[in-house]
Amino acid sequence: MEGDELTQNIEQWKIKRLIDNLDKARGNGTSLISLIIPPREQLPIINKMITEEYGKSSNIKSRIVRQAVQSALTSTKERLKLYNNRLPANGLILYCGEVINEEGVCEKKYTIDFQPYRAINTTLYICDNKFHTQPLKDLLVMDDKFGFIIIDGNGTLFGTLQGNTKEVLHKFSVDLPKKHRRGGQSALRFARLRMESRNNYLRKVAEQAVVQFISSDKVNVAGLIIAGSAEFKNVLVQSDLFDQRLAAKVLKIVDVAYGGENGFTQAIELSADTLSNIKFIREKKVMSKFFEEVAQDTKKYCYGVEDTMKSLLMGAVEVILLFENLNFTRYVLKNPTTGIEKTLYLTPEQEENHDNFIENGEELEALEKGPLPEWIVDNYMKFGAGLEFITDRSQEGAQFVRGFGGLGAFLRYQVDMAHLNAGEEELDEEWDDDFM
């Protein structure tokens, strides 16, 4: 997976987890603030509105609710000050307020502000007993950008489709020589000229494809659809003139009855199924490769939380396969008597077992605690690894979650996991020497 695509996938994953947490939160009265500011807004106007809201809050009869609302408004105003009256390029999302438990006691205070990974067009300000997350969910609509090349004997159009928005990037016409009906040397000469014109046309299309769909030496679309009414579309894809980086991104070649913008519209309609399944197609390919490694017992794979984390820490992992909803907590625990630290990865059920936090009768001190998936996302690059998110919405992904624990990896070299587990202490010492 290329860097820009992986970065976006990570941002989307983080937003999904944030939505899950925010949707569970409840506040006292109208004390939870949801504030979403698109880039076109003026921050001083928003600041003025928050100040006015603070003044109005003095009319709230309940002292507890009034204090909670005013505390949230104050925190919101303080956060906005950090931006020095300048909104980030993609706008700003802010959630603030005290979350209460079932007994009505303050359990946690949220103050979350961030720039979304792409521009947000929604304006929202709501004080409620819950956070409003629909604009975040709208951000997660699969809006990958796809490139289209509509080519025939009359010209070529280059366009993109992102969500419901299509854009024509560039188009040009061509006047190719027609077939010559007469015989003799004249026919041979015209055939040669005709072939030369076709090759020049294909070269121009291939060069323009690079201009439109490659930026900073990287393909800037998630996939390509090549469409046309004649054989040009197939010749282009098979041609050595067509950049191999783009050829690798071709998702489908479709026949359309028209060229130009009408052909663009028809190509979108005929490729709809392919475009909607692009994420699952990628997931199927990754999972098929993983299952093949397992079936052949290449020892260049691992699965399960314990084996995958050991392999990652020793630098053996090439690509981590992470189920997007993996529910494990990472603990770093310290024995207060010996000073020895250890790391545990626990399920919610294991966290309820107090024995996991006792060693030789000693209560272990928790130095670190946090969701394991977040630790992986924050640290995988330190070990030179790649990352692939896996869902349970494809058959292969669901099998990975059920049968392999939702965490696995492709390894750089063969690792005997049985030997790794048996000699864990020796491996830990080697890792300390190499990385500490």
Swiss-Prot record:
InterPro entries: eFR1_2_sf, eRF1_1_Pelota, eRF1_1_sf, eRF1_2, eRF1_3, Peptide_chain-rel_eRF1/aRF1, Ribosomal_eL30-like_sf. Keywords: Cytoplasm, Protein biosynthesis. It is found in: Cytoplasm. GO terms for cellular component: cytoplasm. Gene3D superfamilies: 3.30.1330.30, eRF1 domain 1, eRF1 domain 2. One of its GO terms (molecular function) is translation release factor activity. Coiled coil: none annotated. It comes from the Eukaryota. Pfam families: eRF1_1 (PF03463), eRF1_2 (PF03464), eRF1_3 (PF03465). Heterodimer of two subunits, one of which binds GTP. Belongs to the eukaryotic release factor 1 family. NCBIfam families: aRF1_eRF1 (TIGR03676). Directs the termination of nascent peptide synthesis (translation) in response to the termination codons UAA and UAG. In B.americanum UGA codes for tryptophan. This is Eukaryotic peptide chain release factor subunit 1. It comes from Blepharisma americanum. The gene is eRF1.
